Structures are given as structure tokens and as C-alpha cells.
Amino acid sequence: MKNTTLYTYRDYFVIRGGKPLTGKVKISGAKNAALPIMFATILTEEPCTITNVPDLLDVRNTLLLLRELGAELEFLNNTVFINPSINSFITNQEIIRRMRASVLSLGPLLGRFGRAVVGLPGGCSIGARPIDQHLKFFKEAGADVEVREGYVYVNLKEKRRVHFKFDLVTVTGTENALLYLASVPEESILENIALEPEVMDLIEVLKKMGAHVKVEGRSAYVKGSENLKGFTHSVIPDRIEAGTFMVGAVLTDGEILLENARINHLRAVVEKLKLIGGEVVEENGNLRVFRKESLRACDIETQVYPGFPTDMQAQFMALLSVAKGKSRIKENIFEHRFHHAQELNRLGANITVRGNTAYVEGVERLYGSEVYSTDLRASASLVLAGLVAQGETVVRDVYHLDRGYEKLEEKLKKLGADIERVSEL
């Protein structure tokens, strides 16, 4: 694995606000598509090549996990080459605890070996993020499931067709089920599945491997194979990174050309951005984003895709904190996902949280201060706020950002931001 500098947990950003973001930026591949696709390689014994893979902590931890399981791999210039000579069904607990997506090893390990031992996952601390739907599916598939001492033990008696309906829409639950069912020769049915672009990207990979997958509404019909093939695939662009830069353009009153962004993945974000005062124009496959009118209040409610994404809620809160009027943001996907509200208030925002709703009264300006990141998207909102805050803003614990944004400060610098990463050894 070709090495690039991995940042430390003590890194922080120093931002001097007041400069508009102008220029062009290339959007990286989607982490949330890359991770399940990398786990899909467990299902085959043939070589796999994945391009447009972002160089992030979660990606590197996934590669470490695959290597621990026996895979031979190389990560070079955003391309992953994997020879999945997997010889173990027991995952490394230390790696597992670093990221929530590690639970996606369950499905393919069970598909390949008929059993799996996976540590309970880590990642962002956003309320309750249980894996009960994953385990319920595996039980329905005929597996014995036991959770003890921080591990999930899954043993399969025999592979059989499954007809399973999720109690709620879950992205990783859908992906785990698809990864397992790709190895089951009989046709299975999943109901109430997630339809996120990242899920659809995984389905495209499973089709390349030899599985037959048909999606109708929120149902998926899956007929797998016990001889899945290797594949070559390019990961879709990161719609959340694109959305973050879109907010940055409108918030700072700049103008950004987003390369490698797909507007069809961003309809709900574009709709709200325009209501607030932004403009998004398609140009030769790219997106030009700028502020068209004075910022105004807007109500937002997070929903499963194709609704407004929970992963853009924090960034829009930063934007609405300086928009004229009173806005209401209702969070329906995760509980306790308003930690950034308190930190934005340190910068002078006027935000009140009641239950799963935040009430944002726009202020004339924000002022620099020291703030602390609590999760990936909260970190992004604080950086965005720092870009327009008067004076100097220090954003602590930016290791959260390194889990989901590739070279964020470098991209912001190229757009004109005054931002510096400081490492405390």
C-alpha cells in the first residue's frame, strides 16, 4: 500500500474567515460507495480493480482489515488493486472499532465461509446506530447469531433463499444483505431497501461479479452465484463532498465549478440551496455554484434518499445561521445529531435545539473562536462557519474530517480560503 501522510488525532485547523471560495474543485470518489465495494471483493477469488477511491482513514482501515483477512493489495493514485486470497473469517477487533462500516464484512464473510466473527463497529458517535436490522436479516437467512464480549458470531447452517422486509430503511443493512445474497444461487427478495446512489453503485458491482439484481420500487430481487467473478469498477462521485462545497460557495458569496459531480444525486440539496438564495448551473457535465440572492431562511427535514440527506444537515445549519429570518431543521434519521449547534453558537450563531428539531435565527455575522468537532459532518459545518467568521477560528479534533473528506484543507486553499492544518505531536 503506497503510503501518504496520515494525520494525527491531535491535528486542528486555523481558519481566518472573510475570503470567498472561487475557482474549480474536483470531487473525490464516494467513501460510502467505496467501502462496501471493497468488502465485495471478499466474495471472489479473482483479482479486482477499483478506481476513483478516496484516500481516507476509513478506506485505509478497510484495506488493513482486508489484508488481515489474507488479501494481497495495493493502493496507488486512488486505485485499489486487490487479490482477495481471503483465508480467515475472523476480523481484527482493533481495526473494526475505528469505523462503523466494518460491519459490512459480515455479509461477504458469511457468503464465502458460512461463518463470521466480527467486532462491534465504531465510527462517528451519532446517537444510537444499532445493527439490529443486520442481525435480524442474518437470522432470517438461517444463521445462528450471537453477540457477546464485543463480537458478533454468525454461523450459517445452509444457504437458502430469503424473503426479508426491513423494519426501517437502512443503508448499511441493505448493503450487508445484498453482499450476502450475491452468494446465494436461489432468488431472494428484499423489501423496504435503501435507494441511495451508493447502494446502487454496489449493485452495479455485484452485477459485474455475476449476480442478478433487479430493483423495483423499494424491493430488490437477487439471484446470486457461488462462483462470483473479479471486476473493474470506478466509484461514483461523493455527493456529500459536492454538497459541502456547494454550501461553501453560497455561504462565502463565491463561485465554484465542481468537476466530477452528479446533479441527479443532489436534487434535494440543490432545491434547498436555491430556496436559500444559491444558484446551481450545469455546464458540460460540471456544476457551477454561486450566490444569486441574499440568504434567506428555509425549513429543512432530513429524509431517506431521495429526500434531503442527513449528512448535509450540519452544513446547511452553518449556512442558515447567517440567513435572514428563522429556519427550522428537523432531523429524522439519527438521534442526537445536533452537537454542532452548540459549537456554532460559540461562533455567534443563534440556534436552539428541542428534541429532534433545531431552530435557527439568522445573525448578521459570526465571530472567530475555538470550537470542537464531534463527528464527520459536524466538523464540516464548523469549517464552513469559520470561512465566514470574522477573525480567527480554531477547529479542534479534525481527525473526524479525515474519515470522510479527501485533502479538504488543500482543496479549500486552492479556492482561496485562509486555512492551515496544525499538528500537535
UniProtKB/Swiss-Prot annotation:
Coiled-coil boundaries: none
Signal peptide: none
Keyword Transmembrane helix: no
Residues that bind UDP-N-acetyl-alpha-D-glucosamine: R100, R129, P130, I131, D132, Q133, T170, V171, T172, D311, I333
Listed Pfam families: EPSP_synthase
HAMAP family to which the protein is assigned, alphabetical: MurA (MF_00111)
Protein name according to UniProt: UDP-N-acetylglucosamine 1-carboxyvinyltransferase
Predominant cellular place of this UniProt entry's protein: cytoplasm
